[in-house]
Regions:
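Short beta-strand-to-coil "C-cap" segments at the C-terminal boundary of structured domains/repeats
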Residues: 153-160
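Histidine- and acidic-residue-rich, metal-dependent catalytic cores
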Residues: 13-14, 48, 71, 118-123
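Predominantly a core beta-strand signature of beta-propeller blades
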Residues: 58-61
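Acidic loop->beta-strand submotif enriched in PP2C/PPM serine/threonine phosphatases
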Residues: 27-29, 64-106, 144-145
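Active-site-proximal, acidic helix/loop segment immediately C-terminal to a metal-coordinating Asp/Glu
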Residues: 1-2, 87, 91-143, 160-170
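Catalytic core of PPM/PP2C metal-dependent serine/threonine phosphatase domains
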Residues: 1-56, 66, 80, 140-146, ...
Length: 173
């Protein structure tokens, strides 16, 4: 089985379970597979906080737009497509809950407000050098957590060099 087909089937399995709840329950999800040989990342993001790529000291989002609603949302099966991204040696993928963005801050007058700017998390990733414990520390130093806070870090072979990767990697499926 091709990884993108397996991923699509598993997504639809989960989606059908949540459809059976008839609107009483939805979940956001980021689900993916990495080919350990080529570094190809196959993934789908259903209204989950955007996936971060940390490469060469810079953090950026893999997604640029919302393309899929939460699992359990009716009539989106035809909108499902598997995203493909080519990881390079040393690349780090970071994903996590929306608690990473929703922080309680104080303005100059001491008035509390909620920071919801997703771009701020990219700064915390860079300040933390892509290391989870440092990122978490920087997030907590920036503001008070108001929601659940979880992070997941996946790195592609940090010991490989680019010349050891296969030359042909698909752009999309």
């Amino acid at each position: 089985t091709y990884p993108e087909i397996w991923l699509q089937e598993r997504f639809l399995d989960l989606h059908n379970v949540f459809l059976s709840f008839e609107g009483s329950m939805y979940i956001s999800i980021c689900l993916g597979l990495i080919d350990n040989t080529t570094g190809v990342l196959y993934y789908v993001n259903a209204e989950h906080p955007w996936t971060v790529l940390y490469r060469d000291g810079k953090a950026s989002f893999l997604e640029q737009e919302l393309s899929l609603r939460k699992i359990g949302t009716p009539d989106q099966e035809d909108q499902l497509y598997i995203r493909i991204f080519n990881l390079m040696p040393g690349d780090v993928i970071i994903t996590g809950s929306d608690g990473r963005d929703d922080l309680v801050l104080r303005n100059q007058d001491g008035v509390e407000f909620i920071q919801e700017d997703e771009q701020q998390f990219l700064m915390r990733v860079e300040e933390g050098d892509g290391k989870l414990s440092r990122i978490a520390q920087r997030v907590k130093e920036t503001g008070a957590l108001m929601d659940d806070f979880s992070l997941l870090r996946i790195s592609f072979d940090e010991s490989l060099t680019e010349t050891e990767l296969p030359k042909e990697i698909p752009d999309q499926v």
